Amino acid sequence: MQISELFAVRGYGVVVTGGASGLGLAYAEALAENGARVTILDLNAAQVAEQSARLTAAGHDVRGATVNVTDHAALDAAIDAAAGLYGRLDVVFANAGVDSGAGFVDGWVGEERKRVPEGALENYTDERWNRVIDVNLNGVFATLRAAARHMRPRRSGRIIVTTSLAANKVEPAIGSAYMAAKAGAFHLTQCVALELAAYGITVNAIAPGFIVTNIGGGHAKKPETQATVGKFIPMHRVGFPDDLKGLALFLASPGSAYITGQQITIDGGWGLGFAD
């Protein structure tokens, strides 16, 4: 295979959950800008319409649909529709997620931190816990299940799950439900990768570190937060969604054909320890 073909995704049928903003939008852009046909699924109808229209106007083959990944029947129908439209389903990004509110401390590394009662274990409500698990773990399960239904008969496909550095590293500013769900999503990635490997389907995870998105109420978008946290990251800066585009394209492409069951971290070295 020529090197130019290793990262070729032109004509691929792609679905991205949570694709109208943040990391999901970066994934959608990465694939669409390289000739893939992309369906954005997201809960936010206004953002779905805005981003799909923007990318279409730029000359890319992008459509959108409003879907809540906790509604598994609606999710199945949306993925079925995309596969029917494209005549194939080559790549699915299981990306949709929500944050879980405050952890047991308020503030990121480098910021003034104090324990907060709303993040304490004994104050965690069933509703809060279940909401995060329903989206960040059960939603991933439902997305992988729907993808497998289309990919297994074709004996081909790429599934990419968004996990988190928090799947392996405890961060007290993050709610425990989020970390538990992301850890579960990574283990699910490995389980499904093992099951589907014999069918030529790869299943991998992208684990972002501190990336500037709207999650967490947009706290990461504050310049002062970026400057403070960035000092403790070995690369001396926080990450942005565009930092994930290259990996997203690689994992979706023929170049990653012999990689499965892996979680690849993009965190500027944060998981290695603090920089001076």
What are the language-model segments listed below?
Residues 45-46, 65-79, 126, 243:
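The beta1-alpha1 cofactor-binding region of Rossmann-like NAD(H)/NADP(H)-dependent oxidoreductases
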Residues 1-6, 249, 260-276:
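Short C-terminal tail/terminal secondary-structure segment
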Residues 233-244:
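A conserved structural motif in NAD(P)-dependent oxidoreductases
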Residues 197, 202, 259-261:
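Short, small/polar-rich loop/turn modules that mediate ligand/substrate recognition or access, typified
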Residues 149, 194-195, 257:
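Alpha-helical segment proximal to the catalytic Tyr-Lys
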Residues 3-39:
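Canonical Rossmann dinucleotide-binding motif of NAD(H)/NADP(H)-dependent dehydrogenases/reductases
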Residues 113-126, 160-184, 189-190, 194-198, ...:
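Catalytic loop of short-chain dehydrogenase/reductase
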